[in-house]
């Protein structure tokens, strides 16, 4: 009987023909060999599934399937159910990993009792140039700096025993899944390794949909879901409150840039009303030692926005910032 793979690498695929080979090759060329690839074509309209079938013909550790489009959340959940490995990793089809990636994560998680080990990542462009990197420290805040399900390894038993799955909320499934994971175990560790290459694809959903506030994402619904995730006795509630502050600021600045000033102010009021009503106001300063490893540019944006609010210049800021 063939020995089961140690790691199942789940790759959701949708219209990824331009970069799919790079992604798969980066997995096949790993120094660590005990793995399987579960590549699920999510109703692609290009040659993605044809490419997957070509790989499957010569690589016995690749499993592929294709069906109608159901979204990334459904596809990842399907991958978890199909996984034969003791450990699970996710890779997006336009990203790629360094040759020692699986080995590093396997060595980290197999040597202890961790339910998940989280690494950093680097943002790269078409030419492979690093735009920036997110290198994690050992502090508790580090795992909140990146909420992607990628650049980390999970113990499958932990996911199954806790019935952890991705919710069907487009553009928020990663955030909600990761925050739920964080509340289910104290055995989650961060490492400074950055072997995941997060490709800046100008044509991807995350870079094309966010031109103005996305009408398909109800920010209050997402915030309600976050609040529902947090146990009453959760020791990291203050970190999640700070995360909400960071997340909502990103939502306002990203969506507000190409929106009207009136819509920006409406969204701002809606978010801050929710934070006040639900007792989610963060008391952590951007200078607090607990978040010392956060990127400087993130801290600067949060500090500047706080100052604008305090001196009563929000309306002027919206008028100058918003281009809608």
Regions found by a protein language model. Name each.
Residues 259-324:
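Membrane-interface aromatic/basic loop that binds lipid-linked glycans or pyrophosphate carriers
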Residues 169-177, 225-228, 246-255, 284-304:
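A short, terminal or domain-edge coil/loop segment
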Residues 195-202, 208-237, 242, 246-279:
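Catalytic core of nucleotide-sugar-dependent glycosyltransferases
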Residues 152, 245-246, 309, 317:
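Polar/charged side chains located within well-ordered beta-strands of beta-rich proteins
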Residues 1-219, 231-232:
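Nucleotide-sugar donor-binding/catalytic module of glycosyltransferases
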């Amino acid at each position: 009987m063939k020995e089961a793979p140690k790691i199942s690498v789940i790759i959701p695929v949708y219209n990824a023909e331009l970069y799919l080979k790079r992604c798969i090759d980066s997995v096949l060329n790993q120094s660590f060999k005990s793995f399987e690839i579960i590549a699920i074509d999510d109703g692609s309209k290009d040659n993605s599934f044809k490419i997957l079938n070509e790989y499957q013909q010569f690589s016995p550790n690749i499993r592929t399937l294709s069906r109608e489009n159901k979204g990334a959340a459904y596809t990842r959940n399907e991958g978890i159910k199909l996984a034969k490995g003791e450990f699970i990793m996710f890779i997006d089809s336009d990203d790629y990993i360094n040759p020692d990636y699986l080995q590093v994560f396997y060595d980290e998680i197999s040597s202890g009792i961790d339910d998940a080990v989280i690494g950093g990542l680097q943002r790269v462009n078409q030419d492979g140039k690093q735009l920036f990197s997110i290198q994690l420290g050992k502090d508790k805040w580090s795992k909140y700096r990146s909420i992607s399900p990628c650049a980390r390894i999970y113990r499958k038993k932990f996911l199954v025993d806790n019935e952890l799955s991705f919710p069907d909320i487009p553009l928020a499934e990663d955030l909600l899944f990761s925050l739920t994971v964080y509340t289910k175990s104290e055995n989650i560790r961060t490492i400074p390794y950055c072997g995941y290459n997060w490709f800046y694809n100008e044509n991807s959903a995350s870079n094309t949909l966010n031109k103005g506030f996305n009408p398909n994402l109800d920010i209050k619904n997402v915030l309600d879901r976050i609040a529902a995730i947090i146990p009453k006795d959760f020791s990291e509630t203050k970190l999640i409150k700070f995360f909400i502050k960071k997340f909502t600021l990103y939502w306002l600045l990203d969506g507000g840039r190409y929106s009207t000033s009136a819509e920006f102010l409406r969204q701002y009021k809606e978010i801050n009303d929710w934070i006040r009503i639900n007792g989610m106001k963060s008391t952590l300063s951007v200078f607090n030692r607990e978040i010392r490893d956060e990127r400087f540019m993130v801290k600067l944006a949060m500090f500047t926005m706080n100052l604008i609010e305090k001196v009563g210049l929000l309306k002027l800021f919206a008028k100058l910032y918003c281009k809608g």
